[in-house]
């Protein structure tokens, strides 16, 4: 730091945080969440759901089924709703758009949504991220000007 010129601004940032989870739902195990689903992707707290049929009605039906089952435990939206609400920012890169599921489920509280085929591995992790809690979505930033 001795060699850094006076007046230099120093910015230190961090990654988002993680939470410990208490509740686990295995998608499709003792629940109807795999109805009409082709592939489950994303993080256990932020699932991208790809459907066997990609039509406006199929997206609405799947989002409704997931929301009715999960209730307040998750935010469930169609791709179009996510974009319209700026969930991924005000401008969505076409590459990101291609990767989004037809339906997106973002866990709340201490919930994870485990893929039935990977439940053992995903469920073994203690810390998770990707939900809408403050600790998972805020990134720290410290700034100073060196004198």
Identify the role of each PLM range.
Residues 1-147:
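Feature captures the catalytic ectodomains and active-site-proximal regions of enzymes
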């Amino acid at each position: 730091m001795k060699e850094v010129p006076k007046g230099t601004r120093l910015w230190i940032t961090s990654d988002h945080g993680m939470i410990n989870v208490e509740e686990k739902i295995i998608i499709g195990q003792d629940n109807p969440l795999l109805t009409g689903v082709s592939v489950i992707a994303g993080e256990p707290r932020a699932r991208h759901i790809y459907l066997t049929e990609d039509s406006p009605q199929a997206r609405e039906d799947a989002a409704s089924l997931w929301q009715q089952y999960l209730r307040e435990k998750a935010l469930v939206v169609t791709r179009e709703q996510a974009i319209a609400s700026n969930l991924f920012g005000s401008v969505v890169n076409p590459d990101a758009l291609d990767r989004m599921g037809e339906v997106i489920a973002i866990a709340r509280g201490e919930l994870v949504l485990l893929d039935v085929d990977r439940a053992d591995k995903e469920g073994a992790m203690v810390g998770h991220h990707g939900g809408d809690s403050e600790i998972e979505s805020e990134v720290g930033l410290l700034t100073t000007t060196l004198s």
